[in-house]
Amino acid sequence: MAQANKDTWSADQYSKFLKDRTRPSIDLLAHVPNLSPKRVVDIGCGPGNSTAVLVDQYPNAKISGFDTSPDMIRKAKETLPNVDFEVADLQSFKPDAPVDVLFSNAVFQWLPNGKRIEIVTRLMDHLAPGGSLAFQIPYNLNEPSHASMREVAGMPNKPWSETLKRANISRDQFPSPTEIWDGLKPLCADLDIWQTTYMHVMENHEGIVEWVKGTGLRPYVDPLDENAKKEYIETYLEKLKKAYRAQNDGKVLLPFPRLFVVATKA
């Protein structure tokens, strides 16, 4: 699933919540109509957790995966040594033959603002007739977990203020279901779009920080020195404690909306 700042992804950090991160892949694959594909590609395969779901579902298919992160690919190769993995970039992806299933778990949100529909529709060109593009993305930029990142980043006179202003790390919400429909439907025999909000159970508020350290928090803390990073995370944590109340047993529920799309080519 790695695409942004490709050299700083940590497979170990991402894998701390691997069961929760894998569940959307299982839910997405359940809606893919292709029962016996010959060629399957996992776009942004991460440490191979989503690829393992594909291997279980399609034991007779030729399955491959790619990711921009060398560390993610290293972990994927360790996990699934019989699958072809490579370090590659989605924007330059061009398979040598049509693919039956293009699968992607939590990657397309990292595509450049304004080019997402263009890139996604271009992927349809790589499908065999009747093939499916299936992808899932976090749809949570307006959730407190992510809004708080931006609020802390925008605070004036902080050790991180100038660094993050220069980093220009703003990211827009992925296009809406109606925009996705208009972009993809002319290319599809069938188009299925839905949204699910998962309720992830965190041990405490620090658990939310650990979750987002593996993904959405990275662009904010990676450019900072250790002292600025520590203070940024402490300030961010205080905002989380105000936004998410602890349950009676001390656990914290993290609502996590995700958008799913299965586009089947005519």
Positions of the model-derived regions?
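Conserved class I S-adenosyl-L-methionine
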Residues: 1-41, 49-53, 75
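Helix-loop segment at the mouth of the active site in Rossmann-fold oxidoreductases
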Residues: 9, 93-94, 111
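Class I SAM-dependent methyltransferase SAM/SAH-binding core
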Residues: 39-95, 101, 118
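Conserved Class I S-adenosyl-L-methionine
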Residues: 49, 170-266
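A short SAM/SAH-binding and catalytic strip from SAM-dependent methyltransferases
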Residues: 100-115, 139
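Conserved catalytic/acceptor-binding region of the Class I
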Residues: 117, 122-124, 128-203
